[in-house]
Amino acid sequence: MIQEQLAFLPESLPDYRPFPPARERTVWQGLPQRVKDRFLQAGEAALQTPIAPLPLSLWLDFTRTGRRTAWEDAYFSRRARLCALVCAECVEHTGRFLGAIADTVWALCEESAWQLPAHNSYIRDTPQLPLPDTTRPIVDLFAAETGALLALTRYLLPDELDTAAPGITVRMEQELNTRILTPYFTSHFWWMG
């Protein structure tokens, strides 16, 4: 089905640029001061906030009790941290936030799964599996959102990230291919219809 749709696309697509990478300073410097201040304030707060741990016990808490909040609070705080740090670095562009960005990217790449425990099943309305299968990633809304956040981070700060942590963008691309693109193109998920 996807192959059939691809036949209708032109040979090459123009570059899609929702906004420029951080190295293109004119647009970032031209943001309203209140927006830049808000981004910097959030980034500075994120620098002071450690990366939330995601131990197995939090995943198993959902498996055993159905409680979602402990896992999800830590999971979403990691992603909010990365978003705040990236926006702050794009505005300031001095490298002050890059170490924390690299640490947070690494933490996301090291997660066993990007789907939520409540979505850890391959068939709709069936019980969730007790643990994620790292050899068969599930693409749910939140895994896709994580992939989008990492792709956006790589798009905005590619050279800066590789300067701060050589090779980290390669790892990001590997995880995106393994966890999002390959499963999307080779597996069927219930939400695909």
What do the predicted segments below correspond to?
Residues 1-39, 87-90, 97:
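Extreme N-terminal leader/anchor segments
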Residues 129-193:
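Active-site lining segments of carbohydrate-active enzymes
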Residues 1-11, 68-69, 112, 118-141, ...:
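Basic/polar, acidic-poor N-terminal "presequence/leader" segments
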Residues 77-91, 103-107, 144-155:
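Non-membrane alpha-helical segments in proteins
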Residues 29-77, 86-91:
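Asp/Glu-centered strand-loop micro-motifs enriched in Gly/Pro and often flanked by an aromatic residue
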Residues 13-16, 65-78, 90, 127-144, ...:
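Solvent-exposed loop and edge beta-strand segments that line ligand/cofactor-binding
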Residues 43-54, 101-119, 167-192:
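Long, well-ordered core segments of solenoidal/helical folds
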